[in-house]
Amino acid sequence: MFFLFSKFKLKKWNKLSYEKRFKCFVAVEKKVAKEFNISPIKLELNYDENWNCYGAFSVSSGKKRILLNSRLIEDPRLRFHALETISHETRHAYQFSVVNKDLRWFEFTAKKWKRNWQGYFAASGDSLMYNNQSIERDAQKNSIKFLKRYRWKYRNEKDFKETFDAVFGRYDTADDKARQRYGIFYKWKIERNIRKKSRENN
């Protein structure tokens, strides 16, 4: 585990087979899951060339999985996007574990997440709502925090800087875009949209 993140440096990454790269992904997921005090989530690769996102967390018949775009393994330039995606989707797994239990009256964040799960806005739809809904903001914030740990380690890795700037930029501009659309009460209006969709889905 100590040398795990050193393997993501380009010179070492280029020498790894796809199988070994995937094992690195699995090890990263286990580390993140342990930090969130949840069981590791099974990783699977999606080879659909038309799939336009890097990853997704899903639950089907009680089985949890994180689906990763195969390009994260195939394209060395995307290896740090893989780190961000694994951290992001494992955070969703944590959120799911939090909301699927009896919530006490004062667990306001968990209740907000639960409404959001019930009234979720997919990335393929309204991108502004997607990026500003509470479970996505939380997952984005946590993945940024995760990447920040390794800024010094990867200070000479061009791909890391580009990945971090893209991830942080998306998070940082989401507020501005929401404010432009909804005005100063944008957070309340976004939550109102989620509540409405949650009611419609239940």
Residue ranges and their predicted role:
Residues S17, R21-F25, L83, N131, ...:
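Hydrophobic (often cysteine-bearing) scaffold residues that line and stabilize catalytic clefts
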Residues E84-S97, A139:
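Active-site recognition of the HExxH zinc-binding catalytic motif
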Residues F80, F96-N131:
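Post-HEXXH active-site segment of zinc metalloproteases
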Residues M1-L16:
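A short, surface-exposed helix-loop junction/capping segment
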Residues F80, F121-N202:
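Long, well-structured alpha-helical subdomains associated
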Residues K12, K34-I41, N100-D102, Y150-K158:
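Surface-exposed helix-capping loop/turn segments at secondary-structure junctions
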Residues Y18-S39:
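Zn2+-dependent metallopeptidase catalytic core
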Residues N37, E44-L67, P76-L78:
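Catalytic zinc-binding patch centered on the HExxH motif and its immediate surroundings
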